[in-house]
Amino acid sequence: RNLFSKKICLLWLSSFKHHNISLTIRIVDELESQLLNNKFRNINKPTNILSFLIDENPIVGDLILCHPIIKKEARDQNIKIKDHYAHLLIHGYLHLTGLDHEKEKNAQIMENKEIAILKKLRIKNPYKSNIIK
């Protein structure tokens, strides 16, 4: 069954600051996520999302989402899977704009932007629960 409609996906994407953007969004299994994470980040385990910036102006990038991980996280956090997908798409997009969460200060900036965008979409703050980073 469809996880989200084209209409919902376009609504999420329209909340982004940059309108001149080209994204490829792929949904993969755990094996492919692990292979990509290992190849590009030297982390030999699957992850919920990977972001790959191809070009900065305009933003061109790939977002790779791992459905089994996202489904498990949504279940574990007792949130709607569609809301978790929206959060991760926004999270990945923010990485493409140059934000990261490696340092606490940067993490707070990124989280605040995520929360603000999600609020516009009427999605609750994911950091009030035990979100997996």
Model features per residue range: what roles?
Residues 1-86, 96-133:
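An acidic/histidine-cluster motif and surrounding catalytic segment
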